[in-house]
Design a protein with these regions (language model features):
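Surface-exposed, charge/polar-rich loops and edge strands
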Residues: 2-41, 45-180
Length: 180
């Protein structure tokens, strides 16, 4: 069995609510084992068959979530190796991260961005909002909180494509708890 992390976009925001027990039941219904929910914010960990096609898992889970919850939920899947690699990334100098009043954010992308998408996205960076791209992740270091940033999520997404955002701290905690 291989272990995966699935990050759900827009769950438990406004009327798009899902209880942890419902998410676990959904994972089991679509055939995944050892399901767990990390916090109530759409972070799922589960085991799937080692031979399973990683490319097909998000659609399988999205279909199950739609049937179970009654609304569409985009899924951003990462393997154990990918989670460990993301948690180990240091896209900005340690002194920059320490000096920032904002938390380092990780945007999990649907796929690796094209060169043109990278260029458009990185052009949005400012002195107050630093951006870096590594693989299928965008790292954002806001000088203050993301809500106070001049750089909006919509602008980033328009440049790079669909994504869901987590703090680096959340990714590190998931890596330590489920993938160590």
């Amino acid at each position: 069995m291989a272990r995966y992390a699935a990050f759900l976009r827009g769950i438990n925001i406004n009327k798009r609510r899902a209880r942890n027990t419902d998410l676990i039941a959904c994972l089991e219904e679509v055939g995944f084992e050892e399901p767990a929910v990390f916090r109530a914010s759409g972070n799922l960990v589960f085991e799937g068959p080692s031979g399973a096609s990683v490319e097909k898992i998000p659609a399988r889970l999205e279909d199950g979530l739609k049937k179970s919850l009654g609304f569409e939920v985009p899924v951003f899947l990462r393997t154990a190796r990918q989670i460990k690699a993301i948690a180990g990334q240091e896209p900005f100098a340690a002194k920059e991260v320490k000096a920032s009043k904002g938390k380092l954010q990780v945007a999990l992308l649907a796929s690796k961005p094209t060169a043109a998408a990278k260029k458009r996205t990185l052009a949005l960076a400012t002195d107050k909002d630093k951006l870096a791209i590594r693989g299928s992740e965008l790292y954002w270091l806001p000088s203050a909180g993301t809500q106070d940033s001049e750089l909006g999520m919509k602008g980033i997404e328009d440049a790079i494509g669909p994504m869901t955002m987590r703090t680096m701290g959340t990714i590190e905690q998931i890596a330590a708890k489920y993938f160590s």
